[in-house]
Amino acid sequence: MTKLTARQQQVFDLIRRAIERTGFPPTRAEIAAELGFSSANSAEEHLRALARKGVIELAAGASRGIRLLAGPEDSPHQFTLPHASIMQLSLPLIGRVAAGSPILAQEHISQHYACDPALFSSKPDYLLKVRGLSMRDAGIFDGDLLAVQKKSEAKDGQIVIARLGDDVTVKRLKRRPNGLELIAENPDYENIFVETGSAEFALEGIAVGLIRPGEF
């Protein structure tokens, strides 16, 4: 069993609750504000201590790049699925999406996963396999399984799944006076501006959770 200090346990529990509630880990600034640290640097020190103890993994340069590994009590609350007897959702896993066809077309479904609904902030309709690192700083990495709820509308600031012509992308939505912007959470990627009424744009859904691969 990994031994944590009281403060480290608070940080670990905060990360766990944030992921359970929103599907994503908190930023250093959010940890500092929640726990009353003087600065985000203080949160960073505790995160590094947790990483040294092997209970989390940090992604360099990513504000939300925190992955929970084994907890101090080997807690199964993050990224691991509960025993089959309490699994309630059967979610299709979507791999690559062919140009011009619906996301949930049968040919896109590679398999189904049984998942505990408590893993998600709202009930998802499917899992989408993430390609690339454009959302790295939101804690979304290549190969992750993004839980998606089908929606044709989204709130400002939500992480959305959008269709742009023949492509499907995951970005953070930001409304602008004459359209909207799809924001990448990685400075190596460009944001995408979409004019109001663009026929090339369609909102497919919103992100309601995240599962790491290999944890089923």
Curated annotation (Swiss-Prot):
One GO MF term attached to the UniProt entry: serine-type endopeptidase activity
Keywords noted in UniProt: Autocatalytic cleavage, DNA damage, DNA repair, DNA replication, DNA-binding, Hydrolase, Repressor, SOS response, Transcription, Transcription regulation
Top-level class of the enzyme under EC nomenclature: hydrolase
Pfam families cross-referenced by the UniProt entry: LexA_DNA_bind, Peptidase_S24
Domain of life: Bacteria
DNA-binding interval(s): 28-48
Reactions performed catalytically: Hydrolysis of Ala-|-Gly bond in repressor LexA
Site positions for Cleavage: 99-100
GO biological process, one term: DNA repair
Active site: residue positions: 134 (for autocatalytic cleavage activity), 171 (for autocatalytic cleavage activity)
Enzyme Commission identifier(s): 3.4.21.88
UniProt similarity note: Belongs to the peptidase S24 family.
Record-linked PANTHER family: LEXA REPRESSOR, LEXA REPRESSOR-RELATED
NCBIfam families in the record: lexA (TIGR00498)
UniProt function note: Represses a number of genes involved in the response to DNA damage (SOS response), including recA and lexA. In the presence of single-stranded DNA, RecA interacts with LexA causing an autocatalytic cleavage which disrupts the DNA-binding part of LexA, leading to derepression of the SOS regulon and eventually DNA repair.
Subunit structure: Homodimer.
Name of the protein in its database record: LexA repressor
Organism encoding this protein: Paraburkholderia xenovorans (strain LB400)
